[in-house]
Design a protein with these regions (language model features):
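Conserved SAM-binding loop
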Residues: 18, 72, 267
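Short, conserved phosphate/pyrophosphate- and ester-handling motifs at nucleotide-, phospho-/glycolipid
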Residues: 22, 52, 76, 271, ...
Length: 487
């Protein structure tokens, strides 16, 4: 398909005339897609309300209509779900598509970079500002540098290419000053031919939004490096944003939970300490929770966990084998029904691991136990960002109300040594370590309540009702990080 035909097909999917910036971005995209250079890459940077989502949606619909293969990816499960809703086709986490498990070691599974068997495929990655490249998380996944691995994966395929979509005004990954995946210079360093464009003009449909009006003003402060005073948020004249006096917060949160539910309401705050205060206040004063943890509570995973999904895959495989043996043993049924029917979720469709930031709803609290100086519970959990997948797992309760992001190093060491005492009858150290790494209490999920979260945890998500708590601020506390956070 030539440039003009592809451009025409995309315009047909818009439903309204594109803005000049969208039209320019479209020109760049069709040049990128028709470039014969196998190492072409494109960056689509767009601020809030500039039509980035509608443009990417039109691109996806067009490519599917003309039978061009496309794969949608995002850094987190929540972001992938939003990308899927906006585009009308399935989206996956980057980790799920580019890594495969090499070995399971209890605390940290080892994931190698997968072979790219895709051909002639466009990989579209949304929320690319979240893609890190410092390897702060260790080397559990590939090289430990997500951007490196993503680029290596895509361009080892035959005639595959990459489109990175994101907002450079958002918070960069932890430990980085800017988002490397949105930097043309960074991508050129990989030997790639970079196409890039920026959307800055707020589209007409968004101009009546107070959220986007204020986000645009804050983004302009970032763009022009004009961070000399605290931003003045405008509330008057808009129906989608308002100032919330503290005295009204409890009633307002209760109304939100009633109108849109716990899953679609969030409080975004600046620190784990303040998130902890909000979570306790919401549970006690809004939801009337009296127990430490109850059915209906919303939780967030705060440390990657590989054990429980590996156990789930084993159980699924065992049940499927058992069902096959049962059918084969009944010769009449085997002849009448040669195919084993099962409602089991295929093991390859469940999450590879539970990631830091994943949310879960407590469906049932079935057992509590105090062991090794810590508190545990067995829970039935439902994961709204993974098609309401249900999983029974052991959870560590001590992290629920701690001010630390997860168990501290000293606490992790304490738990390890206490559990090790139960395996002293195993003489060989290697065998003993293997047994500990398979212990359900050593691998208990570390969780916090998910009614209030920090901005990094919320990034890439989408909620119907959002409460933003900036805390007490003075001019002396004004920093670029704060402005990015507020944006």
């Amino acid at each position: 398909m030539n440039i003009e035909e592809l451009k025409y097909q995309i315009l047909q999917q818009f439903g309204f005339p594109p803005t000049p910036e969208q039209a320019q971005a479209l020109d760049v995209f069709v040049q990128f897609m028709t470039d014969s250079n196998p190492h072409a890459v494109m960056i689509l940077r767009g601020s809030a309300g500039t039509g980035k989502t509608s443009l990417s949606g039109a691109i996806v619909r067009t490519l599917r209509a003309v039978r061009q293969k496309v794969m949608l990816l995002a850094p987190t499960g929540r972001a992938a779900k939003v990308f899927s809703l906006n585009s009308g086709m399935p989206a996956y986490t980057i980790h799920r598509r580019i890594y495969r498990e090499k070995a399971f070691a209890g605390v940290d599974g080892q994931f190698n970079l997968n072979d790219n068997l895709y051909t002639d495929t466009l990989f579209m990655v949304d929320e690319a500002s979240m893609i890190a490249n410092l390897g702060l998380g260790g080397t559990t996944f590939g090289s430990g540098c997500l951007l490196d691995d993503l680029i290596h994966f895509v361009y080892q395929g035959r005639n595959d290419r990459l489109l990175l979509i994101g907002d450079k005004a958002q918070l960069p990954p932890v430990g980085e000053e800017e988002s490397p995946a949105l930097s043309a210079a960074m991508l050129q360093g990989y030997g790639l031919s970079v196409y890039e464009c920026d959307l800055n003009e707020v589209v007409r449909q968004s101009q009546q939004s107070g959220i986007l009006f204020n986000a645009t003003r804050i983004r302009q402060m970032i763009t022009h490096d004009d961070i000399t005073q605290l931003p003045k948020i405008r509330f008057s004249g808009f129906s989608d944003i308002r100032e919330m006096p503290g005295a009204e917060l409890i009633e307002a949160l209760g109304d939100s939970y009633h109108q849109v539910g716990l899953v679609d309401t969030i409080v975004v705050t600046r620190s784990n300490k303040r998130a902890n205060i909000f979570n306790q206040g919401i549970r006690n004063m809004v939801l009337d929770r009296e127990e430490e943890l109850e059915s209906g509570d919303m939780l967030m995973i705060v440390k990657n966990n590989y054990y429980w999904m590996e156990e789930e895959r084993k159980k699924i495989k065992e049940r499927q084998l058992s069902e096959e043996r049962k059918v084969k043993s009944e010769k009449f049924n085997t002849l009448a029904n040669p195919t084993v029917q099962s409602n089991e979720v295929p093991s390859h469709e469940i999450p590879a691991f539970l990631a830091n930031g994943d949310r879960a709803k407590v469906m049932k609290v079935s057992r509590r136990i105090d062991l090794y100086g810590f508190h545990f519970a067995t829970l039935l959990l439902k994961f709204p960002d993974y098609d309401n997948y249900e999983l029974e797992a052991t959870v560590l309760l001590d992290t629920l109300t701690s001010e630390a992001p997860a168990l501290t190093h000293d606490q992790q060491e304490q738990l390890f040594h206490k559990i090790e005492e139960d395996y002293q009858d195993i003489p060989l150290k290697a065998d003993r370590m293997k047994a500990i790494r398979q212990d359900p209490y050593f691998n208990a999920l570390q969780v916090k309540f998910a009614y209030a979260v920090t901005c990094h945890k919320a990034q890439g998500g989408q909620w119907s009702h959002v409460y933003v708590d900036q805390g007490y601020m003075t001019d002396e506390m004004l920093t670029p990080d704060y402005i990015h956070w507020l944006y």
